[in-house]
Amino acid sequence: FQDNKLLGDRSAYENVALPLIINGTGEREIGRRVRAALDQVGLLDRERYPPRALSAGEQQRLGIARAIVSRPKVLIADEPTGNLDPDLALEVMGLFKRLNEVGTTMLVATHDLHLVERFGSRRIVLAGGQVEGGAGVQAA
């Protein structure tokens, strides 16, 4: 999520719908799932806005909505809370935790050790590209 690759000429709704359109999902299902994803990240009231009209934090959450709308089995998030204020960061990590609880494997790369301690069930510490340690992981 460091670079969301949002489509600037499309609305928030259209940005989130894109993976479902590509997969051939029906229009009614697209509408239901896109609105649910936007609601989960607190952007339902911004569905008609283009990304340029959103704050950096809102753009970050829009990218997250697009990532979760297709209900992936595995979600890899690189600094997903980087542009968010602390309260929103907690909300996003809470969303990730709920996704994990219903079967989505989450891999979150972050420098925010507080979030790791609060939400991570397992962690791996990397230093200089090498595994340095972590819960349940042998140091390299």
Summary of predicted features, one role per range:
Residues 64:
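Hydrophobic anchor residue at the start of the ABC signature
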Residues 86-88:
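Helix N-cap at the start of a conserved alpha-helix in ABC-type nucleotide-binding domains
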Residues 10-17:
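Short coil-to-helix segment of the ABC ATPase nucleotide-binding domain corresponding to the Q-loop/switch region
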Residues 75-78:
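Catalytic Walker B motif of ABC-type/P-loop ATPase nucleotide-binding domains
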Residues 29-41:
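ABC nucleotide-binding domain "signature" region
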Residues 49, 70, 102:
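Conserved signature/switch motifs of ABC ATPase nucleotide-binding domains
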Residues 50-54, 58-60:
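Conserved ABC ATPase signature
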